Amino acid sequence: MSNRKPYVREMTRTWWKDHPFYRFYMVREATILPLIFFTICLLVGLGSLVKGPLAWASWLDFMANPIVVALNIVALAGSLFHAQTFFSMMPQVMPIRLGGKTLDKKVVVLAQWAAVAAITLLVLVIV
């Protein structure tokens, strides 16, 4: 066994800011933070619904707060950004072939957004 110390290159905590690819990756992964807030709000709302009309009205008042509305808009934007990056990655990771030919990437991405729009419309009509 050697007594030599292995070379360990020092890295700053902000090393990723110097590389556009990693900066984009970190922004994409950071979109989870507003979604965590949104999920917690929904869970608290579910608990308020179980507790009764007074708790439900209190939760509705909380959700009507302009800061909460702004955070929910940020969560929606983050969710759409995350979906866009996922949808644009999908044809590269799993190319779809029909009749021996690979479908155009734009067709696959547009089909995914069409499915999102159709499901959203269906949920809005049902609820």
UniProtKB/Swiss-Prot annotation:
Q: Name one GO molecular function term.
A: succinate dehydrogenase activity
User: What's its membrane topology?
Assistant: Multi-pass membrane protein
What subunit structure does UniProt give?
Part of an enzyme complex containing four subunits: a flavoprotein (FrdA), an iron-sulfur protein (FrdB), and two hydrophobic anchor proteins (FrdC and FrdD).
Alphabetized NCBIfam families for the sequence: PRK04987.1 (NF003445)
Family under the similarity heading: Belongs to the FrdC family.
The entry's function note states: Anchors the catalytic components of the fumarate reductase complex to the cell membrane, binds quinones.
This protein is called what? Fumarate reductase subunit C
Q: Which gene does this sequence derive from? A: frdC
